[in-house]
UniProtKB/Swiss-Prot annotation:
The chain crosses the membrane at residues 100-120. Belongs to the peptidase S9B family. This is Probable dipeptidyl-aminopeptidase B. One of its GO terms (biological process) is proteolysis. The gene is DAPB. Residues 121-917 are vacuolar. Its main location: membrane. It is found in: Vacuole membrane. One of its GO terms (molecular function) is aminopeptidase activity. The active site is at residues 756, 833, 866.
Length: 917
């Protein structure tokens, strides 16, 4: 469940400005994958929530100017043109027009009066949204209200520029890649960040590609993504990109020569075959790539392609992850790593022969693009995915090496490693002189080992081992953020080392291990704040590490630096303000793209880091369009606070309608995600679905980061292990009870909703509550039984079903009697969800049928995946949520045993309609 991931928070989950689309690709794409991300992704919701995770994927919004100097990912818009109906026939006589208009107004008036009488005579009245006139003083000048279309579109998205920092061929710092879609100054350029501030100067600018198209043998190639070689002489080009899963894709690859501005196929003998992955050698003299799950090497000195592996196929993957490793471990599409000297390539060999398949059916579309066989046109297309569910056989992974000079593959045995079927390889990091660090865990992700391998001597040993389960009952989150620190005796570093995140005094902190085989680190950070997916940048010359921390409060983010010896801890951002920052650093950490993400209107600036002797600052985005909109619209107010439940201090965000009146009674909607290590209560600026509910519908929205979530200490996080949903549901219910007791809350109108893991939590909460506090629930793409979810995620937090059968039983949504005690609940799911299979929803429906429970609604979206966006589905999801919620708080879903027709109401409506009955 990766990144609203997921569903993520992905999403709606992210990679620094074009990282993944333009950066020097010499290893796995670097993702700022926080320890919080479950692959029950926060990705879908994040698109609605306008959330930018870490320094990676940001949201884009309307532009204020024509400044195209900073690179943005392409934005696709769905444009639906209204049907144009031409007029025809003779002009209508004026008197006839007048008569018709008079009749129309009289009819409309009568219907309007009847409607008003009907509403006021009905007992099902509800809190009317506060009028815009009453809200002028607390919001914009006009007090306008946002619409659902506003929050689903680009209207309120902060514009976010991505900068793809590039390591200079000669050690230059502060170089960046730029792409200009108009091609006025070249399509792809490398520029010095300092000299580029002077737009009249071309100093430091190198044009790599004049245009985004070129011709090869009469075929026009249109760039989808580009990766310059480290020496800037050749560009690796991807065209005809086709998405596979969340992170993976295929396409045609080309080599574009910068000097001649001409291109050639990466594999001249098979230029029409689609490739899964390609990456540059650090020396710019070769490209390794994977096609049909086999690996190949193309040296630029020749047009010949060398076959590295030949037995890859459906069950055997080389250099690329399978579905579960892509989703839950690497959050990316690469399992290939070049050594710094270019002499060796490390790669994963993934054997899926024992992994069961899950069929994903497509009833409307044919994603394969292939025509069905004759006579099979009316059958759904089925895609079989190797998907290991909890307790099922996992893929067996081995780290192998390719000696580029000798052309041979070899493996290195390490004593006392986990058995093949009980091992997860979660990170690979090259050091120097042929040494490589491999991070592994056991299947349940609670014992960590670090193995150091020497590929020159072909020997290896375990240099560090940690039993996380014994330490605090927790688990190991896979990250790709460990940083190698090379030896530099002149700068006080006699040995190689690495910076890693460790558990120290109940928090995630930074630690420096040196030499590589030293298991005892120097702790770099301490205190109550937790490190966020760090380090973010390393300045080797000045001996500094930069990192992001959840500041004085868990809903904040601030940037700090500290020396390699743990001294001179300094803030980079203004820690006196309660703010949320994100950052990406240049290769040498002399410069940074600083992203202010809230609570006020986001802005971005490129700065020199404090240790840089040459001060520099350039504002590149202020989001003036949002500042202007805020002056016109009335939005919700936000109240951040802590609520103590069972001795744990939980972050809570309350969104109040404009012109909040404490003497009124408001309905309340709880919105949650709640996955292990995740965070939903933060100070990012966002105008999302929750904003619409509070600002326009006039309801209070409450979000609680309960036990199990991130950045409030490992004690509260680890407690949920083995019993997902138990403590988290209790926290939601106990906080809801406190809100129900508030004088401004209508305790008879309380609902809860979530997507993905949040969908699971919605159902678990209303199951545990049994209608005593919440009356309504809305669950989108929910897990209903962790046995149905993928093994790596589920077992990380629940152990295996064989180890913890009782925990799986109690976590499953199964108490149909309790669900029946709620007034009503809604479940929505996509049929082609490859992440949270619709099996979850269908088995729940079967339980409800067997128990004769019918107080629920279901909406199934054909061919939609976990994001639910096929054929207008994304808009329908949120429209359905909003309408269903209004009906609920209107009292339209009141339970009635043995309902009978209301004849008097029917006759009254028929009379108003002019019907004779």
């Amino acid at each position: 469940m990766a990144t609203e991931k997921g569903h993520g928070r992905d999403d709606e989950e992210r990679v620094p400005l074009t990282r993944g689309s333009t950066e020097f690709r010499n290893s796995i794409d670097s993702f700022d994958y926080s320890s919080s991300t479950a692959s029950l992704s926060l990705a879908v919701i994040d698109r609605i929530n306008n959330s930018t995770q870490d320094a990676a994927l940001g949201e884009k919004g309307p532009r204020d100017d024509d400044d195209d100097r900073y690179w943005d990912d392409d934005v696709e818009y769905d444009v639906e043109d209204a049907d144009y109906i031409p007029s025809g026939g003779k002009p209508m006589h004026k008197s006839v027009k007048i008569a018709l208009w008079t009749l129309l107004f009289l009819s409309l008036g009568g219907w309007s009066l009847a409607f008003v009488l009907f509403i006021f005579r009905s007992h099902d009245t509800y809190e009317t949204p506060i009028s815009s006139e009453d809200n002028i003083s607390s919001g914009g000048l006009r007090g306008d209200r946002i619409t659902l279309d506003d929050v689903l579109g680009e209207e309120w998205m902060p514009r976010h520029h991505f900068i793809s920092w590039f390591p200079g061929p000669n050690g230059e710092d502060g170089l960046l890649l730029e792409k200009d879609g108009l091609g006025s100054t070249g399509y792809l350029r490398v520029e010095d960040i300092v000299s580029r501030k002077d737009t009249k100067s071309s100093k430091g600018s190198i044009v790599l590609m004049q245009k985004n198209t070129f011709t090869v043998g009469g075929e026009t190639v249109i760039c989808s993504q580009v990766w310059p070689s480290p020496d800037l002489k050749t560009v690796l080009v991807l065209s005809e990109k086709k998405q596979n899963w969340r992170h993976s894709f295929t396409g045609k690859y080309w080599l574009f020569d910068v000097d001649t501005q001409t291109g050639q196929p990466l594999d001249p003998a098979a230029q029409d075959q689609r490739i899964q992955l390609a990456s540059w050698s650090p020396q710019s003299d070769a490209v390794v790539f994977t096609r049909d799950n086999n690996m190949f090497l193309r040296k630029l000195s020749s047009k010949e392609v060398t076959t590295i592996t030949s037995d890859g196929g459906v069950d055997l993957f080389y250099g690329v992850p399978d579905w579960v490793y892509e989703e839950e471990v690497f959050s990316g599409n690469s399992a290939t790593w070049w050594a710094h000297d270019g002499n060796y390539i490390a790669f994963l060999r993934t054997n899926e022969s024992a992994v069961p398949e899950y069929p994903v059916q497509y009833f409307v579309s044919r994603p394969s693009g292939e025509d069905p066989n004759l006579g099979e046109e009316n059958y759904p297309e089925v895609r079989e995915i190797k998907y290991p569910k909890a307790g099922a056989p996992n893929p067996i992974v081995d780290l192998q090496f390719y000696d580029v000079r000798k052309g041979e593959i070899f493996s290195v045995d390490v004593a006392d490693r986990f058995p093949d079927d009980y091992r997860l390889i979660i990170e690979v990091l090259w050091a120097s002189n042929g040494k490589i660090l491999v991070r592994e865990t056991n299947r349940e992700s609670d014992i960590l080992i670090i193995a150091a391998i020497d590929v020159l001597s072909r020997t290896g040993k375990i240099v560090r081992k940690e039993d996380i389960n014994a330490l605090d009952g927790g688990w190991v989150e896979p990250t790709q953020s460990t940083r190698f620190i090379p030896a530099d005796p002149s700068n006080g570093r006699p040995e190689d080392g690495y910076i890693d995140t460790v558990i120290h005094e109940g928090r995630d902190q930074l630690a420096y291990f040196t030499p590589l085989d030293n298991p005892k680190p120097l702790i770099l950070t301490k205190g109550p704040s937790e490190i966020v997916n760090s380090p973010s940048g390393v300045d080797l010359k000045r001996g500094l590490v930069y990192f992001v921390v959840a500041g004085n409060e868990p809903w904040e983010r601030h940037v700090y630096s500290v020396k390699f010896d743990g001294t001179a801890l300094q803030p980079v951002t203004n820690v006196s303000e309660s703010s949320y920052y994100d950052v990406s650093f240049s290769d040498g950490a002399g410069y940074a793209l600083l992203n202010f993400q809230g609570p006020k209107v986001p802005w971005q600036k490129v700065i020199s880091t404090p240790a840089n002797e040459n001060p520099f600052e350039e504002i590149i985005e202020q989001n003036n369009h949002l500042s202007r909109k805020l002056r016109l619209f009335s939005l919700e107010s936000k109240v951040f606070q802590y609520i103590n439940i069972d001795g744990f201090s939980l972050p809570v965000l309350e969104r109040r309608p404009p012109n909040f009146d404490p003497t009124k009674k408001y309905p309340v909607l709880f919105y949650l995600y709640g996955g292990p290590g995740s965070q939903t209560v933060d100070k990012k600026f966002r105008v999302d679905f929750q904003s619409y509910v509070a600002s326009t519908l006039g309801y209070i929205v409450v979000t609680v980061d309960g036990r199990g979530t991130g950045y409030i200490g490992r004690k509260s996080r680890s407690i949920v292990r083995g019993k997902l949903g138990h403590y988290e549901a209790r926290d939601q219910i106990e906080v809801a009870k406190k809100w129900a007791a508030k004088p401004y809350v209508d305790e008879s109108r309380m609902a809860i909703w979530g997507w993905s893991y949040g969908g699971f939590m919605t159902l678990k909460t209303i199951e545990e509550d049994g209608g005593r506090t919440f009356q309504y629930g809305m669950a989108v793409a929910p897990v209903t039984d962790w046995r149905y979810y993928d093994s790596i995620y589920a077992e990380r937090y629940m152990h295996t079903p064989q180890h913890n059968p009782q925990g799986y039983d109690s976590s499953a949504i199964s108490n149909t009697t309790a669900l029946a005690n709620n007034v009503r609940f809604l479940v929505m799911h996509g049929t082609a969800d490859d992440n949270v299979h619709i099996q979850n929803t269908l088995t729940l429906l079967d339980k409800l049928d067997l128990a004769n429970v019918d107080n629920y609604d279901v909406h199934v979206f054909p061919d939609s995946n976990h994001n639910i966006n096929f054929h207008n589905a994304h808009k329908i999801v949120y429209t359905r949520l909003a309408d269903w919620l209004v009906n609920a708080f209107n009292g339209q879903w009141l339970k009635t045993n043995n309902p009978t027709p209301n004849d008097s109401l029917f006759r009254r409506a028929a009379t108003w309609a002019g019907l004779s009955i």
